[in-house]
Amino acid sequence: IIISNLISFPKINEIYELMGLLSQNNYSNYPPIHQTITFLTLLITDKSIITSIISLRLILILFDLGILYYGIKLLKILKKPKNIIFIYFLNPLVILELIGNLHLEGVMVFFMVLSFYHLYRKKEIYSGIFLGLSILTKLIPLIILPLFLCRLGLKKSIRFILTITVLISTGFVPFIKFKSLINYSESINLWFS
């Protein structure tokens, strides 16, 4: 476990033992922004798991506030009632999984909302940047990439894809070590086995 060499939690070995074989025997398949947020949360706390959990929960709440702010702005552009945004926030899955269980899909959704916001403002470069950041948080937004391309047309799609490609390539620079890329790829391949 790489983090155990950098950060010393008193019960890190006990936690590692409780992870289960799938997590113990494979490297993380989370993209760089996800890794960075969780790593920084561990780094800034006082080596207390409780403090780390509270810190991560506060970070996720800040991203949720960003979803609220830009979600309302996006709904205004779309000429939809702004109270629709509360369908997202009152969804039990969002409440339990994102804030309760500390999943970083809320960070991904924040960047996706910003991407859509800029898409509807006809700023495809900014839209590409934020979709790239969303992909660097979780890989799920790759699924909706074709929807953007249909809306943008060929010329703007090329700029959009180039923006995302440069951003994602830059985001993976810390993984340039060939062995790290192999470990990441092997973990991603678990999804398809």
Give the ranges of each region predicted by the language model.
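Primarily membrane-embedded glycan-assembly and transfer machineries that use lipid-linked glycans
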Residues: 1-101, 107-113, 152-193
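Membrane-interface alpha helices of multi-pass inner-membrane proteins
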Residues: 95-98, 114-118, 124-149
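Residue-level recognition of short, well-ordered coil/turn positions
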Residues: 123-124, 154
